[in-house]
Amino acid sequence: MRKALAALALVAVIGTGCASSAAKAAGSNTVLRLGVFPNLTHAPALVGISKGIIQKDLGANTKLKIFTFTSGSEASNAMLAGSIDATYIGPGPTTSLFSKSGKIAVVSGVTQGVASLVVRTGAGIISPADLAGKKVADPGVGNTQDVALKTWLHSNGLKTTDEGGNVTIVPLTKNSDSIQYFSGKQVDAAWLPEPYPSLLIAQGLGTKFLDERTLWPSGHFATTGLVVSTGYLTAHPDVVKNLVKGNVDSIRYIRSNPTQAEQIANTEIVTLGGKSLDAAPLAQAWAEMTFSWDPAAASLQQDAKNAASLGLIDSVPSNLLSVYKLDDLNAILKDLGLPAVPVPA
């Protein structure tokens, strides 16, 4: 009898846990918990938050609650834990999240094509071969730029020390640490998203060795996308559609008001705990970026193939392109009289 009662109690606990997990995933239609980074590559989010564009599109019945992260892994863990409902995030973490849970959806593109390999002034790097025996910084293992860097090294006959090669990868706690690492000669190069290449160059600490856009067809590759949990999408489709509209309207504002948007994004970075950018590198970085609701799906698939070949993920999910749920986006674009984004298949 006691064993039977214990078994029933265990089932009850498991059932309660499952219900709790499901409730977390479903979230609430009265609050949307949105992840964002104090990075310039998240400018549509920064502008949308500061100008109240996203909140306006969500409506009076849904409160926007912002969660700030400094890395894709932090945001990914929050998504997996059900602590947030949606986040702005790069393609590397997106693929990893989808591989782990399958319970996320990319509902819109955000930013394309803004990363470069910068070499430190005086490091003596004039060809890829010169990186042998050198230290190269990037935002962290499995990050979008980490995948790009290691793939490029392989294409040039180089390997990291973890792979038995002689290029040491130095993961950064924060991308802004690259300034200190360059000035202190702690690293010889860095593969980073904007604005950090522009900052390093503006301060005379480095020179641009490679613009990642040159490695992609037509120079288009995803840097940031808008991702939601499928649990939240299923439970609150109207809220998600309003969020997508907020993202589209934020990008439209940036396109119509580029100078004002540049300053708004810079100010919001500080509000969210980041550092303000000086005028010259800010302007240079801003000019490098393309803000688009097109998620550049082909680049996500290639990123996943690259990550798999590097052993960063076990394999490319056969259904990876199903991560794109663009019906809401295309309905919004149709209402605005704008061309639809092709749905990956």
What kind of feature is each model-predicted range?
Residues 70-73, 88, 139-147, 176, ...:
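Soluble non-cytosolic domains of exported or imported proteins
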Residues 66, 79, 131, 136, ...:
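Mature, folded catalytic cores of secreted/periplasmic enzymes
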Residues 55-62, 214-219, 287-295:
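Short, solvent-exposed loop/beta-turn-alpha elements that line the ligand-binding surface or hinge
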Residues 92-93, 163-166, 174-270:
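Pocket-lining segment of extracytoplasmic ligand-binding domains
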Residues 1-31, 335-345:
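Short, low-complexity disordered leader/linker segments with a strong preference
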Residues 24-174, 188-194, 205:
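Short, glycine-/small- and polar/acidic-enriched structural segments
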Residues 234-315:
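Secondary-structure end/capping motifs
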Residues 305-345:
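Conserved C-terminal helix/tail region of periplasmic/extracytoplasmic solute-binding proteins
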